[in-house]
Amino acid sequence: MEPQIERGTSRNASLFFSLPILAWAMYDLANTIFSMNIVSRYFPLFVTETLGQEDIMFSFAVSISMIFIALLSPLFGVLIDVRQKKRPYLITFALTSIVATGAIGVVGQMLGTHPSILYVGLGLFILANFAYNASLIFYNAQITDLGSRSEMGRISGFGVALGYVGTIIGLLAITPFVTGGVPDWVSKVLYLAPVAPGTEGGVNLNAFVPTALMFLVFSLPLFFMVKDRRDAAADGQAFQGSIVKEGYSRVWRTFKSAKEYKGLFRFLIAYFFFTDAINTVIAFMSVYAQGVMGLSASQLTLFLLVATAFAVVGSFIMGFVTDKIGSKKSIYVVLWLWVVALIIASVANTMPLFWVTGILIGIGMGSTWVSTRTLIVELSPVEKRGEFFGLFSLSGKVSAIIGPMVWGVITYLLRDYGDLGSRIAILSLLLFVLIGMWLMRKVPDGSKEIV
């Protein structure tokens, strides 16, 4: 049974100013600050630039955190469907990610140049990234509590757009902390390292505690204002044994019943491939921009801001486009953008050409999550929605194990050939997008009933 929340076309403008929807979307803003500041920018640079390690070390950390998510996603889906409680788990994982992120900065300062800093930092990052991704499973499933099926595209688009506004806020707000542009008392309170005058790009380690605080502050509206709704269609679901046993039993039963949900399973397989490329681009964007294109720290910040600005516009518009033409057609449009972006990025040897790549990547990132999140809602029956959101996450997270490892192995094997390894690595991602597009051919239109 869909939630009965002010159905009708009159909600077009007022939809986004509903307090629960606005509070829910604020978490998109909060977690995207973490994703950009930590996953895409400062942690990979901390590993490769500050500690002087190869890309493959960061690749391992990302992949390990995704292995844990892949293993536990089925259990989270059961918790959503059977207990119908998303909020407590979302808050728990969000706070875990926040604490682990801040700990990287604090412990890093305490250890200084001690050799153990690499392994402690990698361990804390694995925990932070795991918890962040776990929170998204419960967060994505909350969208069904906020509006009718016909409003999913707009609600999803609003969340993604606000999320990328968070990226802009995060990038701008973090700069003075990293470059030493804050008062001494602030540096002492936040346990920041001193920044020597003329230090190019500042101190990467100083990004972690302020990012953790921003993540926390912008998460508070969701923590206090978004409540769980019980769904009558899912009430009364009983299961034998423990949550663990039931979680994996359900996954097995779901795969056995693949014939019943052919369209949805085709989509999950397609999603596995094309999101592999997207997750890898997000993870290595900063490393590629600085290592291959030679962007300075300030140029990288501007590049990311421009990409994010286009992500905001793209995601907001894609919400309306998805509601208008359907999520499947929208996904095709977005994937063609990724094809063009990856080709240009792999051959770009001038700044103007690379800036075009940044714009396309920005539009592609924002639009991808809008259309895919909407399609999974359209294709999944309400009583199994949590289960399928778990599989949706599982598909994306397993792919996030493979992509970074492919990148890391290629760049490691070709490390003696300059930037050729990175260019081949980013071009290799094109194959994953094309496979995903080919598999999408037989995914049904989400507006039709899937049986």
What is the predicted role of each segment?
Residues 88-103, 329-344:
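Structural signature of the two symmetry-related core transmembrane helices
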Residues 134-147, 367-381:
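Intracellular juxtamembrane helix-capping segments at the cytosolic ends
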Residues 106-108, 214-225, 427-451:
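Multi-pass alpha-helical transporter architecture, strongest
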Residues 71-85, 313-327, 411:
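Helix-to-loop junctions at the C-terminal end of transmembrane segments
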Residues 100, 107, 113-135, 353-367:
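Hydrophobic core of transmembrane alpha-helices in multi-pass small-molecule transporters
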Residues 178-213, 409-433:
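A membrane-interface helix-boundary motif in multi-pass transporters
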Residues 8-70, 263-303:
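Helix-loop boundary and gating motifs at the non-cytosolic
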Residues 2-21, 227-268:
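Juxtamembrane intracellular "pre-TM" segments in multi-pass secondary transporters
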